[in-house]
């Protein structure tokens, strides 16, 4: 038989391809290779249509520059005072302006205070007293310098002038005032008077919010003296105490009528002086009054 050469036939160009396909089909790993090709995700190889579409769009509204007014607003306190404010401010309150039903007649009592100055240093003014049946029984005025030592406490120093009882008397005063806890106001003041007389006073009051407008206020005051003073009816040690409970209704924050009751008591030699003058050692009083501030 005569054999034709491979390059001499018309189909000679297809023979290498057929032989390669037959050889691959006969290999043992051909099925695994085919399965692997079928499991490939050919769609993941597609190129994104527009890469620039994924970038965030830039705002067409320009951001305005920060102004001095913007910077100042950052440091503005909600209470109306600037940080380290040097402006002069003031506050005055008639904490007690009341009529009292005393055992020996009706009485008018007051407890006023206020300040004027800056956030750190202030002039403090205080006054309290009582008139019974048209006669002044007690009256005093204090003028103090106050210096803030923290956000809640001030040290105070100045002078106190007594007009009644007895002859007028002048005291040097120094102490602390502030808030021990929220809404608990405390004043602790020591006094040095004429002829080596000394005294101390501790006052506290607390505002208990019953509703937005109804407030119950317990109060307390203790007075101490270093030595006996028969002319003014003050004995050494714990001299007098006064505790009160007042319920006020705030028609506005600046105007609040109230009703309440107080308990007054004298101790030791002070009580002895009261008995000698036919005065009560202890008594309870019904009170009606107004609380004002501006």
From Swiss-Prot:
Pfam family for this entry, one? CopB
Q: Which GO terms describe its biological process?
A: intracellular copper ion homeostasis
UniProt topology in membrane: Peripheral membrane protein
GO MF: copper ion binding
Q: Which InterPro entries match?
A: Cu-R_B_prcur
Q: Which GO terms describe its cellular component?
A: cell outer membrane
Q: Does the keyword Signal apply?
A: yes
Give the principal location in a single coarse category: membrane
Region Disordered, residue ranges: 40-60
Taxonomically, which superkingdom?
A: Bacteria
Q: Where in the cell is it found?
A: Cell outer membrane
Q: Which UniProt keywords apply?
A: Cell outer membrane, Copper, Membrane, Signal
Q: Where is the signal peptide?
A: 1-34
State its role. Answer: Exact function not known. Could be involved in copper resistance.
Protein's name according to its UniProt entry = Copper resistance protein B homolog
Q: Give the organism, scientific name.
A: Pseudomonas syringae pv. tomato (strain ATCC BAA-871 / DC3000)
Q: Which gene encodes it?
A: copB
């Amino acid at each position: 038989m005569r054999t034709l050469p491979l390059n001499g036939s018309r189909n000679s160009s297809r023979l290498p391809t057929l032989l390669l396909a037959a050889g691959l089909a006969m290999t043992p790993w051909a099925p695994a290779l085919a399965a692997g090709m079928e499991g490939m995700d050919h769609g993941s190889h597609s190129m994104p249509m527009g890469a620039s579409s994924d970038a965030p769009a830039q705002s067409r509204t320009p951001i305005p520059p920060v102004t001095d007014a913007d910077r100042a607003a950052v440091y503005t306190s909600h209470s109306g005072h600037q940080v380290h404010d040097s402006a002069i401010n003031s506050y005055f309150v008639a904490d007690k302006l009341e009529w009292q039903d005393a055992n020996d007649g009706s009485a008018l009592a007051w407890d006023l205070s206020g300040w004027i100055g800056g956030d750190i240093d202030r002039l403090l003014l205080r006054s309290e007293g009582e008139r019974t049946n048209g006669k002044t029984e007690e009256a005093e005025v204090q003028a103090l310098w106050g210096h803030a030592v923290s956000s809640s406490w001030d040290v105070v120093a100045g002078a106190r002038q007594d007009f009644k009882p007895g002859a007028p008397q002048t005291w040097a005063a120094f102490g602390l005032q502030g808030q021990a806890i929220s809404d608990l106001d405390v004043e602790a003041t020591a006094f040095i008077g004429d002829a080596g007389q000394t005294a101390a006073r501790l006052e506290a009051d607390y505002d208990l919010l019953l509703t937005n407008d109804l407030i119950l206020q317990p109060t307390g005051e203790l007075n101490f003296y270093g030595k006996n003073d028969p002319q003014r009816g003050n004995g050494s040690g714990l001299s007098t105490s006064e505790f009160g409970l007042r319920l006020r209704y705030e028609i506005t924050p600046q105007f609040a009528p109230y009703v309440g009751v107080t308990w007054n008591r004298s101790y030791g030699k002070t009580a002895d002086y009261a008995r000698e003058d036919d005065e009560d050692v202890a008594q309870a009083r019904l009170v009606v009054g107004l609380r004002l501030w501006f």
